[in-house]
């Protein structure tokens, strides 16, 4: 072998070793970032909803939850950002300086192609950019960046949410266990709130408050304000119902029963918590589940059973509340009182079960027609209820 051939062979070996080393470093970096993201998701989905300071009740609950969320977000996102910057610097150093222009053009092309393929992520990034621009141009100063006390929805929080979304979208992987843990946390939150409606206060959060106090009717569970609770379930209920539908579609009975029971408690909590927005969240989410499941065999029956279970639960919970004399816990100016004493829950549960049996017995073509009719009828009914409600105000 000539000297030139030996030199070429050595260069090929060196390049192969360097490429293998680079691939190993890339894999370790990805695994590390996935671990950080897993910790972040567990903290946000599991720890944050259940977090409270024993003995403080609802005093400064919003502040303590915000500081926990802010600190966890800054730590996890800071770690991910630092690792990414180091990786980019190393990648730039490995590139030949003579081909830096070509490298930049390739990178620019990749970014444009990536934005086209990830339209949702691009839209979220633009939303964060608009929030930053709004805070910079605002005359409110610190309030535009931080927000008000116990309502820290300024540009900083929006950017933290955008960063959390990007981190979860890139590095979350298939961490289904964390989603199930988040579902369990949401069920615990709902159960604590439902027990409070019966006069039980397992965590002592209502200690010191009496009937007539604003906190007694508006604050519940470990989330506090009923509007905060509705906002929390506007995210968690679609996730919970999607897990339930997936378990039912795959034929996992035990998981379907557990997830179905949890969803029943969450729907009941939204009906009784006092915010009309929470009732709308529950109804719209259930309707979307029925709509998206219309072409999938065997999903409408579990959803109808879940809905009938929620109706029976509402009937029983309302009866127990009246017998225990805890009816005054419900808001006087909301829809919760009407929900608690409505006598049509049993009839609605029977209708759901009858519809389930008829739907199960029909052939596929007639099932589709029945589904479309039920969905359109429910929309007309909802429109009628909304019009009646507006005219009554």
Residue ranges of predicted features:
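Hydrophobic alpha-helical transmembrane segments in multi-pass integral membrane proteins
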Residues: 60-133, 341-351
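Membrane helix-loop boundary segments at the extracytoplasmic
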Residues: 51-60
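Perimembrane loop-to-helix junctions flanking transmembrane segments
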Residues: 59-64, 210-214
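Membrane-interfacial, low-structure loops and terminal tails that flank and connect transmembrane helices
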Residues: 10, 17-31, 90-118, 330-332, ...
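Charged/polar low-complexity intrinsically disordered segments
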Residues: 3-6, 11, 15
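Membrane-water interface of transmembrane alpha-helices in multipass transporters/channels
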Residues: 60-61, 148, 299-301
């Amino acid at each position: 072998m000539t000297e030139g051939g030996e030199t070429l062979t050595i260069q090929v070996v060196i390049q192969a070793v360097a490429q293998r080393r680079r691939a190993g470093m890339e894999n370790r970096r990805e695994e590390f970032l996935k671990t950080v993201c897993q910790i972040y998701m567990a903290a946000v989905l599991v720890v944050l909803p259940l977090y409270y300071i024993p003995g403080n009740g609802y005093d400064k609950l919003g502040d303590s939850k915000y500081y926990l969320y802010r600190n966890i977000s800054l730590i996890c996102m800071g770690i991910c950002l630092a690792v990414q910057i180091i990786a980019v610097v190393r990648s730039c150093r490995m590139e030949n300086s003579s081909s830096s222009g070509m490298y930049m053009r390739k990178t620019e092309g990749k970014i444009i192609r990536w934005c086209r393929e990830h339209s949702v992520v691009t839209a979220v990034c633009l939303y964060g950019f608009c929030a930053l621009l709004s805070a910079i141009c605002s005359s409110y100063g610190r309030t535009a960046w931080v927000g008000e006390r116990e309502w820290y929805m300024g540009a900083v929080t929006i950017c933290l949410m955008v960063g959390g979304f990007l981190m979860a979208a890139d590095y979350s992987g298939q961490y289904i266990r964390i989603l199930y843990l988040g579902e369990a946390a949401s069920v615990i939150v709902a159960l604590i709130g439902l027990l409070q409606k019966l006069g039980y206060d397992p965590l002592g959060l209502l200690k010191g408050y009496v009937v007539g106090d604003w906190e007694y009717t508006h604050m519940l569970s470990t989330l506090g304000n009923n509007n905060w609770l509705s906002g929390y379930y506007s995210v968690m209920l679609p996730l919970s119902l999607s897990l339930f539908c997936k378990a039912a579609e795959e034929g996992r009975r035990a998981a379907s029963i557990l997830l179905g029971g949890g969803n029943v408690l969450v729907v009941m909590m939204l009906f009784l918590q006092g915010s009309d927005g929470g009732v709308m969240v529950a109804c719209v989410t259930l309707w979307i589940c029925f709509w998206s499941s219309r072409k999938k065999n065997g999903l409408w029956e579990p959803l109808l059973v879940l809905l009938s279970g929620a109706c029976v639960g509402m009937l029983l919970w309302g009866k127990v509340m009246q017998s225990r004399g805890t009816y005054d816990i419900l808001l006087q100016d909301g829809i919760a009182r009407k929900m608690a004493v409505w006598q049509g829950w049993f009839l609605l549960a029977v209708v759901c079960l009858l519809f389930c049996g008829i739907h199960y017995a029909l052939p596929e073509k007639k099932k589709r027609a029945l589904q479309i009719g039920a969905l359109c009828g429910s929309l007309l009914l909802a429109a009628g209820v909304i019009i009646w409600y507006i005219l009554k105000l």
